[in-house]
Amino acid sequence: THIDNLDDFIEYLKLEKFSLLVHDWGGPIGFGYAERHPEKIKNIIISNTAAFTFDWIPFRLKIARLPFLGRFLIEKLNLFAKFATFMTTTKPMKKNIKEAYIFPFLKESSRKGVSSFVKDIPMWPEEQSYELLVQIEHGLWIFRERPICIIWGMKDWCFKRRLLKRWLEYYPEAEVHKIKNAGHFLYEDEPEKILNIVSDFLKRNNSYEKVR
């Protein structure tokens, strides 16, 4: 799994203790890793993601999950990557930024992973990753006493405000920053603002031991 891949990568880097930032699929993958190694996590930054079960996805993703049509749109036409360059931000991306997002998926063979990711969104108990997501959700409480910062793009059509509210049920003491004019790729919409938020949070919470 991607959790195993992340585990191997962090082990290779020999990281003993670090701050964890999760976004999109990084939510379940990052928390899946963190729950295996809670002693390594100093603090956590969460942005526009979910690491818990939910029973709603946007119509656009439902289309992408259709067995034959979804695969054709993603793998043959590369529409998932192309649409991501203008449907995930509130401000137009520069040409070179768009090209950077599309570059890893120029070949049809390189899009199979994208197709698999979309198909693997665990909505129902019978789906492949659902049980693992439930396990991750049940482990979220482990980090309730850690410093947690939530940064949320409020104009995200996919990870909507209802998911931000869910996060606050798990981490009611979290520091929250709502970025009003940012979409799903909030780091593209408001890079300087978010850089300042993250830098300030890390300076104030450089070590879990100090906070305790």
Set out the residue ranges of the language-model regions:
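Short beta-strand segments
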Residues: 21-23, 45-48, 115-118, 149-152, ...
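Active-site loop/oxyanion-hole signature of alpha/beta-hydrolase fold enzymes
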Residues: 1-22, 196
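Conserved hydrolase catalytic core segment
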Residues: 16-56
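Helix-rich cap/lid subdomain of alpha/beta-hydrolase
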Residues: 56-116
